[in-house]
Amino acid sequence: AAEPRLVLRSGDDSTEEYPYHIAFAAWAEAIDKASNGEIKLEVYSNAVLGYERELIEGVQMGTIDFCTTSLGPFGSFAPQINVLSLPYIFKDVDHLIRILDSGLSYKMNAYIEEQNVGFLSLGWICGGGRCFYTKKPVYSVKDLANLKIRVMENDVYINMVNLLGAKAVPMAYGEVYSALQTGVL
């Protein structure tokens, strides 16, 4: 087979079973088929190209063409995006989707472009809400006192957890397992 004329790279820090990766893999197949093999999208999962912040920086530098990322790391590059991360601003996932579909996603995309941060958003997805997972039950805010809780590397999440009385531990998602093993969390 002939070499592709264009090779693009996509990265995420999730497993190959995660919906983001599955979607990018399907997109890669569609691109290959539609271009008759002239365009190839290489899809890297499991943080092979880095965790979310490194993926975003890779897109900025041009070493990565596409990535999926959470709002936490993303908001560090375009701060007004953080409004979507504010605690309890959405009632549920349907509420978030209605807001994004109302035109907010286009306004956010325009804002990102205006910031000239070196990347654009191709779309918005809901990756789920934020929950606390602990070894002991949490019935009230008092139960969070001094618990070490992993948060994304973003001031909105760090401040929220600290204001609830817990101790925010900012780190990439892929570092959680070893942090649990070593007692960091």
Language model region names:
Residues D65-T69, V169-P170, L185:
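Paired acidic/hydrophobic, glycine-rich loop segments that form the ligand-binding mouth/hinge
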Residues A1-V7:
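Short, low-complexity disordered leader/linker segments with a strong preference
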Residues E29-D32, Q60, S70-K167:
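Contiguous mixed-secondary-structure segments that line small-molecule binding/active-site clefts
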Residues Y44-E57, E153-V156, V169-T182:
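Short helix-initiation/N-cap motifs at beta->coil->alpha
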Residues L41-N46, T69-S70:
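Surface-exposed patches in mature extracellular/periplasmic domains of secreted proteins
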Residues E17-E42, N159:
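Short, polar/charged alpha-helical segment
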Residues V7, E38-E42, K148:
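Residues at or immediately flanking beta-strands
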Residues V7-A25, N46-G50:
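Extracytoplasmic "Venus flytrap"
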